[in-house]
Amino acid sequence: MSDPLIVSYNDSAIYQSDINILKSNQWLNDSIISFYLEWLKDGGEDNKNKIPNQVLLLSPSVVFCCSFVESEQEIQLMFEQPLSLKTKEVIFFPLTNNRDPNVIGGGTHWSLLIFIKSLNKFIYYDSINSFNSSDAIFIISKFKFLLSSPPPKTNLKEFLINQKTPQQQNGYDCGLYVLSIIEELLKLIIKENENNKGEENKISYKDLLLSEFTNELLFKEITPNYIKDKRVEILNTILKLKK
């Protein structure tokens, strides 16, 4: 059965099967997650909201690939130069609970891990009560070279902060929650960058991302109706690009 290409955008590709997912109440796959992250990197529709250079959005495929790389040294060799990981102040990791290298795009749940360099810790958002927390620890074990004093594996939980997260009301919107949290946090980062007249070094990412204001904002903005609209918004964005 054919699955025609609808849109090719930067390093992402959207097929008809992805459109079908967005049109129905289905779990978002890695293709849709990757597309929207690329869209956010480019600053959205008007290309004005570009993220600071100190912030990195990793694609699901990179995170998935690193899950099966044996050593941190190999990950550094593969990704340090092209992505400049150690120069970034904030790194977003979209996670699934797929541990099977033979199943591309598999898993049953998305969650979000964020490394904050100035904090020297990772923060974690999960729309189903830390369902993927063991996967977060697993990914930290692969990227603990980012920490200023890399700990032994037994102490990794000390470097993870579970954040209160808006909770999904069904079994399929987790990916939309991840994208929505990323987008709302990026809006705050971009605004803070503008307030500092583009001087990125003046931004306190630790204070910004861990503030009570930020957490309250996420709960205020990311409601079930917001999530429902976000699914439609992503679909419409793709269809506009198709034209």
Swiss-Prot record:
<keyword id="KW-0833">Ubl conjugation pathway</keyword>
<dbReference type="InterPro" id="IPR044613">
    <property type="entry name" value="Nep1/2-like"/>
</dbReference>
<dbReference type="Pfam" id="PF02902">
    <property type="entry name" value="Peptidase_C48"/>
</dbReference>
<dbReference type="GO" id="GO:0016926">
    <property type="term" value="P:protein desumoylation"/>
</dbReference>
<feature type="region of interest" description="Protease">
    <location>
        <begin position="12"/>
        <end position="185"/>
    </location>
</feature>
<comment type="function">
    <text>Protease that catalyzes two essential functions in the nedd8 pathway: processing of full-length nedd8 to its mature form and deconjugation of nedd8 from targeted proteins.</text>
</comment>
<keyword id="KW-0645">Protease</keyword>
<dbReference type="GO" id="GO:0019784">
    <property type="term" value="F:deNEDDylase activity"/>
</dbReference>
<dbReference type="InterPro" id="IPR038765">
    <property type="entry name" value="Papain-like_cys_pep_sf"/>
</dbReference>
<feature type="active site">
    <location>
        <position position="109"/>
    </location>
</feature>
<dbReference type="InterPro" id="IPR003653">
    <property type="entry name" value="Peptidase_C48_C"/>
</dbReference>
<dbReference type="GO" id="GO:0005634">
    <property type="term" value="C:nucleus"/>
</dbReference>
<keyword id="KW-0788">Thiol protease</keyword>
<feature type="active site" description="Nucleophile">
    <location>
        <position position="174"/>
    </location>
</feature>
<comment type="similarity">
    <text>Belongs to the peptidase C48 family.</text>
</comment>
<dbReference type="GO" id="GO:0016929">
    <property type="term" value="F:deSUMOylase activity"/>
</dbReference>
<feature type="active site">
    <location>
        <position position="126"/>
    </location>
</feature>
<keyword id="KW-0378">Hydrolase</keyword>
<dbReference type="GO" id="GO:0006508">
    <property type="term" value="P:proteolysis"/>
</dbReference>
<protein>
    <recommendedName>
        <fullName>Probable sentrin-specific protease 8</fullName>
        <ecNumber>3.4.22.-</ecNumber>
    </recommendedName>
</protein>
